[in-house]
C-alpha cells in the first residue's frame, strides 16, 4: 500500500464461484483498472480475481464517499474510482471469507477452530502443488494463441477443486513461448488465462497463482519478438517460476509437488526440490527422466498426492 502510494488497496483472491462475484481487473503492476460487478454477461472472460471486501483506504479517499446516499463499494464506488484514483490490489491465498450468512459463519468458525486460518497466514510455511498447464489442465493443441483454443479437461476442475479444499495452494507454472515466437502477446496470454479461469470456475475450481515464461532461447522464427528471445531462469526445465512462487508465498518446497506431462516439468521440479508426478496426458509419452510417480491424469495425480500425504498407521 505504501510502496505503491495507493489511495486504496483491495484484498483480492480467486474463489469457486467467480460467476456471481465482483471481479477486479488489474494491470501487471497490480493497479486496479476496472471492477466488474455481478452479475456478469454470458460469454465474457474475466480473470478469477475476486473482491474479498477487505480494504485499506486513505482518509482522503474515504472523504470521497457521498454523504446521505446509499453506496456500495463494489457496485458504485470502486468502478468509478478505478479511473480517478490510485487503487491497487493485494492478491493472496490467505484465508479471507465473507461470513454474512449463517452457513458461511459456520464454515469460518470451523476454519478458525481447525487452525486453517492461522495455517494460511503467509508467515507460516505453505505447501503447494505446482501444475503445468498445457497437457495437464487443458488439451495441448500446440502453442495456444487464442482463448478459443483453450479447452480445459473435463477432469481438471474436480482435481483442482480437491486441491482448493486441501491444505495445499495451487500454482500454475507454464512455458508460453508463443509470445517470443510472435504468435500472441502478453495481453493475449492474459486473455487465454481468463478463459481458463472461467472454465475452471464453472466447475467450482480455481488456481491460487499463475506464473508463465514468455521467453524462448532460440531464434529463427519469421514473426519472433527479439526482446523475448533470450536465455532466462524462468523457462522450464529451469526452476525459476517455482522459486519465485516459493519466495512470494513462503512455500516449503520440500513439502510440495510438481505435476507435469513433459520431461522439462520433471526436471524443473527436481531442480526446485519438490516431489514430481508425471501424467500420461499431453506429452506424457515423450521419453525423459523418471518422476517420483506416474499418473494417468491430473485427477489421478492429485489422488496419489493425497495418498502419499496421508499418515499410515
Map each language-model feature to its residues.
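Residue-level signal for inorganic ion chemistry
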Residues: 1, 24, 30, 58, ...
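A short, conserved acidic/glycine-rich loop-to-beta-strand motif
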Residues: 4-14
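Active-site neighborhood of HAD-like aspartate-dependent phosphohydrolases
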Residues: 126-171
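Catalytic-core segments of class I nucleotidyltransferases/pyrophosphorylases
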Residues: 2, 15-18, 28-118
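Metal-dependent phosphoesterase signature
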Residues: 138-154, 179-188, 202-203, 225-234
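Acidic, Mg2+-coordinating phosphoryl-transfer loop and its flanking beta/alpha structural elements
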Residues: 257-296
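Conserved Lys-Pro-Asp/Glu-containing loop-to-beta segment of HAD-superfamily phosphomonoesterases
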Residues: 225-227, 233-263
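Substrate-recognition element of Asp-dependent hydrolases with the DxDx(T/V) motif
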Residues: 156, 160-196, 203-222, 269
